[in-house]
């Protein structure tokens, strides 16, 4: 099998797997809803109540959510389908997430290199890096927003900083582990050639860290979307998926399908950035294999 046909097969397999996962989620959703409606909101054969109500306000039908995506909604002076409305909002969120992902990756890799170079830095910084992730984001986001506005920073910068806070951690930890992964024999070989530390870093340690970096990038990319949405909700911005979710939550009793549709849009955005990192991983690894061959 040629490399091109193998790539096409993998892509087709990924599409089929994603489609089957969506179908399974819809079947479970509708099956749970049907069961609750048939039994009066209890587990079959028992008097135990289901954990989530199955009425149309709490759990609208999946078909109703899908139909809402093509219904019209007001956007300023114009009217457009909800799917297009969410796509416009997602574009703003994607920009904020991309900035946060970039900054978080740079900071994470920079911290990893610093901790690799000086062991005292690892002992001093790594515990604090771990502790930083115990601070609730919902409490930290308003602080970052207030600080940013006092400094005169645009809202997109403050939101991106919230994404950065979430993304740097997995990159820093995984990058450090990857940079430390080369065998001691390989490191000693570089030393025997009198290779400078920088040469060892770029020629040996960074290539060895690739299998550790890309999984971290995937996690960081999805976290950047979460951070951007939380930031939009905290800052009260007029754009982004976070704003759409907040607005639809306030009108939940009237249009519950719109809130679910906006949540689906956020999930799709997360899957999109995850897919972009996966594609980059395949391209980089394929090029590496070609060079080795």
Regions found by a protein language model. Give the residues of each.
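Transmembrane alpha-helical segments of polytopic membrane transport and secretion proteins
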Residues: 1-23, 275-293
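Periplasmic/extracellular loop-to-transmembrane helix junction in inner-membrane transport proteins
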Residues: 3-4, 37-102
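Alpha-helical membrane-interface segments at transmembrane helix boundaries
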Residues: 87-95, 99, 122, 129-132, ...
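Transmembrane-helix boundary motif in ABC transporter permease subunits
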Residues: 99-129
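Generic hydrophobic transmembrane alpha-helix motif, especially the helices
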Residues: 126-170, 177-178
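Transmembrane alpha-helices
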Residues: 161-164, 197-231
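Short cytoplasmic-facing helical segments at TM-TM junctions of multi-pass membrane proteins
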Residues: 174-213
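Hydrophobic alpha-helical transmembrane segments of polytopic membrane proteins
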Residues: 241-281
């Amino acid at each position: 099998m040629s490399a091109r046909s193998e790539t096409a097969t993998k892509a087709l397999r990924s599409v089929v797997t994603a489609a089957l996962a969506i179908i399974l989620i819809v079947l479970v959703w509708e099956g749970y809803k049907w069961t609750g409606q048939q039994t009066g909101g209890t587990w079959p054969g028992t008097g135990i109540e289901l954990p989530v109500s199955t009425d149309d306000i709490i759990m609208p039908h999946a078909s109703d959510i899908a139909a809402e995506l093509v219904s019209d909604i007001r956007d300023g002076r114009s009217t457009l389908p909800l799917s297009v409305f969410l796509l416009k909002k997602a574009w703003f969120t994607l920009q904020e997430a991309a900035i946060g992902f970039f900054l978080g990756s740079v900071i994470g890799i920079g911290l990893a290199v610093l901790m690799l170079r000086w062991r005292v830095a690892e002992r001093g910084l790594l515990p604090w890096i771990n502790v930083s992730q115990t601070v609730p984001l919902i409490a930290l986001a308003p602080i970052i927003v207030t600080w940013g506005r006092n400094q005169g920073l645009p809202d997109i910068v403050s939101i991106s900083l919230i994404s950065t806070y979430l993304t740097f951690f997995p990159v820093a930890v995984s990058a450090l582990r990857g940079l430390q992964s080369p065998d001691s024999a390989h490191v000693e070989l570089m030393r025997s050639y009198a290779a400078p530390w920088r040469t060892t870093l770029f020629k040996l340690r960074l290539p060895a860290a690739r299998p550790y970096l890309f999984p971290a990038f995937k996690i960081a990319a999805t976290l950047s979307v979460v951070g951007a949405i939380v930031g939009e909700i905290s800052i009260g911005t007029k754009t982004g998926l976070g704003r759409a979710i907040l607005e639809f939550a306030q009108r939940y009793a009237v249009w519950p399908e719109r809130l679910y549709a906006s949540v689906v849009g956020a999930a799709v955005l997360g899957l999109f950035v995850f897919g972009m990192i996966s594609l980059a991983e395949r391209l980089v690894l394929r090029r590496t294999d070609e060079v080795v061959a």
